Amino acid sequence: MKIIVGEPLANSNNTAYQTLDIIRKSARISTLADTTLTTHGKPVFVPDWGGKCNAVLCVAVRISRLGKSIPQRFAKRYYDALSLAVKFEMSGMKTELQKACEPWYMAENFDGSVSCGTFEELSDKEVGNIKILLKNGEKETALEIENLGKSIDEIIATASEFLSIRQ
């Protein structure tokens, strides 16, 4: 299991959000089945059944060991790398399910719905200083990991209260 950290960095029109207030208030944590992840440049196949599909950019944290109820001060021991990930969402299906007050996780949690880039190894000092620049035509958006609203350590500690994290 990987923990996907962060809110969408761009909307369906590929324009940057004006502010990252949503991220600053609380970082979103998504847990995904192993089959949702594609890595190493493997192709992503979008299912026909979902309708319109949007891509959402996220930050992925690679978990390096098994843990449960991890105190924040020890969280650094449980992850070793970061990557950018593209999460594909079936937005048409998600909207219909939300209107019907039905669970909409299947619109985001299907086989191959998350494509992770190459994980970059971290040192203890690097985590707060990482800056990610997204280039889309002429626009650039900068995301600083320290501006996610919660630190990665805090997110790992929170997630491990509710479920075991593992490699």
What label would you give each PLM region?
Residues 1-166:
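Catalytic-core "active-site belt" of small-molecule-metabolizing enzymes
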